[in-house]
Regions:
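Conserved Rossmann-fold NAD(P)-dependent oxidoreductase catalytic core, especially the SDR/UDP-sugar
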Residues: 1-39
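Flexible, glycine-rich beta-alpha linker
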Residues: 15, 57-77
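Active-site Tyr-X1-5-Lys
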Residues: 17, 35-62
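Conserved C-terminal active-site "lid" loop/helix of NAD(P)H-dependent oxidoreductases
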Residues: 102, 138, 163-171, 175-206
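Amphipathic terminal alpha-helices
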Residues: 194-202, 206-228
Length: 228
């Protein structure tokens, strides 16, 4: 049975590190050629390509940037680190980051199920803003009561070395680790800008939660659930 609409949540990560020269960077657009540099991005890209081969199948693809909010663990690790007085960053080249709060992704999924113009198309999702590499950690620090924080910035080669060692050792031990070469590629990417105007036009998508409010809600949830 063919569904009336299939919404696939892909990722901005399918594009890898593109449009990183010159600075200021240009937003990644749907017309750009995907160049995934992680297993996660490659899997999403392969799924997108498969959907495009299915005949008479009404699909819509959503490509959110970094999704955060209640229950999300990667950004929780950052919050936990800041509570413990350490903020670790890598790379000295400017980094433009984008985010989307989880409820805005839900909004987009719902709208994609209804919008006829969206069938067989792919759309980026973010909150429509671009942030520097300190924005998220500074907001976390504020919501955690402004604890003193030691800001450490390491060169990319150091991150790559740590991720390579961690990934190799944990692979030998049969353990999963978030510090691997895929994580290196994600953290080292400098340009996470994306163009959400097509989503606004075709889906009627409009971000409701900007970063300051989203971080406030996230930290509140982490505290309520005993994560922080």
């Amino acid at each position: 049975m063919v569904p009336s609409r299939f919404v696939f949540v892909s990722s901005l990560s399918i594009f890898g590190a593109i449009r990183e020269e010159p600075y200021p960077y240009e937003p990644i657009r749907e017309t750009d050629i995907p160049r995934p540099n992680t297993a996660y991005g490659e899997s999403k890209w392969q799924a997108e390509q498969f959907l495009a081969t299915v005949k008479d199948f009404p699909y819509v693809i959503l490509r959110p940037t970094g999704v955060y909010g209640p229950r999300e663990r990667d950004y929780y690790i950052m919050a936990k680190s800041i509570k413990q007085h350490v903020d670790f960053a890598v790379g000295y080249k400017p980094q433009d980051i984008t985010f989307v709060y989880v409820s805005d992704v839900v909004q987009a999924v719902y709208k994609a199920m209804k919008a006829e113009a969206a069938v067989s198309h792919a759309y980026f999702l973010s909150d429509g803003q671009v942030y520097n590499s300190r924005a998220f950690s500074d907001l976390l620090q504020k919501e955690l009561g402004n604890p003193w924080v030691l800001h450490i910035k390491a060169p990319l080669w150091f991150l790559r070395l740590v991720c390579a060692i961690s990934g190799t050792v944990n692979g030998w031990l049969g353990k999963l680790t978030t510090l691997n070469l895929d994580k290196y590629h994600i953290l080292s990417q400098r340009n996470w800008q994306c163009d959400i105007e097509p989503a606004r036009r075709d889906l009627g998508y409009e971000p409701q939660v900007l970063l300051d409010e989203g971080v406030r809600r996230s930290v509140q949830w982490y505290k309520q659930e005993g994560w922080l």
